[in-house]
Amino acid sequence: PELRSASDGDVDYSDGVFIVNEDWYGHQNSTVNFLTNQGEWIYRAFQKENPGRELGCTTQFRYNLWQPLLFCVKTGTDPGAKITGSRFAVCDASTMEVIKEFPYIATTTKTDKNGKETLISIADGRSYLPVDEHKGYIGTSNGIYVFDNDNLTIGGANQRYG
């Protein structure tokens, strides 16, 4: 199929349906396809609108009741991928262009025996629940984190329950 993009002036990503694909683990990062209301498929829309960028491995959730689009992802990179993707991505709802990417939702540092510190992820993305147009909750493998939509920041974890 012919590859088109919003920069061509004829794709409005607010007028159709997204299909979020976890993809084939061990081979590549997640992809996002788009079906226009006219029945035309736009394949790999995220990569097409953001050359050189990808979502991470096993995208779990996409939300856009209010502008912008939000993608929540389990891990940053599939073992077979060449690009480290984002774990949480904020995109323009009409153009799909990245506004902000987060390589991690939450981190800690690990120090090896030589004293070298390494930043590691402590929270794999699972879901997103909006509270209103200003705030939402990111569900992770390590608690619930607050996303500030006005400042595009991820805050600390809420107390874990259960």
Where do the protein language model's features map onto the residues?
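Acidic/polar, low-complexity intrinsically disordered N-terminal segments immediately downstream
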Residues: 1-93, 97
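Repeated scaffold domains used in trafficking and secretory/extracellular systems
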Residues: 4-6, 53-63, 107-133, 160-162
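Short beta-strand/turn micro-motifs composed of small residues
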Residues: 21, 125, 140
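Beta-propeller fold detector
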Residues: 41-52, 98-106, 154-162
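Surface-exposed, polar helix/loop patches in the mature regions of secreted/periplasmic/lumenal proteins
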Residues: 73-127
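Intrinsically disordered, low-complexity linker/loop segments enriched in Gly/Pro
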Residues: 135-162
